[in-house]
Amino acid sequence: SKTSGKAGYQPVCQNEWTPLCDKRKYKCADCPNRQFSPLTYNDYYRHLEGKDSDGRDVIGLYVLNEDNTCHLLCTDFDDKNCEHGYQDDVLAFVDVCRSWNVPYSIERSRSGNGAHVWIFFDSPELAVKARKLGNAILTEAMNRDGKIGFKSYDRFFPNQDTLPEGGLGNLV
């Protein structure tokens, strides 16, 4: 926001600021005229290119589907002044993924002080099942190396097993 100087994310609605949009009467989540804009290849390209210094090209993703399934699990690691940094925790986590034949992709966080480990599924999985997989990988990684305390582990996306009614879940 140019007014507050803070970054924020919100779904892009095709009806925002049109005559169908009545922000005085409805929150976006409750709006009967809510119609999300579809992502385009140009949106993806601009996001990956990352040239907008104000971050307007950044895309967020709501991971949880309406039927409580997800197409991916994202594990968030942030450097919280842990002795060894987040990198060792990430490497221990992906070492388990590798040994269990779980494909993954590592992405450095926008801040540069952390990373996301992405696990993509061939078909939608129940969020509860995806989160159990993440917990199993995390537990095994901790068991393999007692020196790693995983202080940098922040959370999984999706954050919850079920989608709150009328909600979108958590954004990554």
Label every PLM stretch briefly:
Residues 1-113, 120-132, 136:
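Signature for HUH/AEP ssDNA processing cores
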Residues 138-172:
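Flexible helix-coil linker/hinge segments at domain or subdomain boundaries
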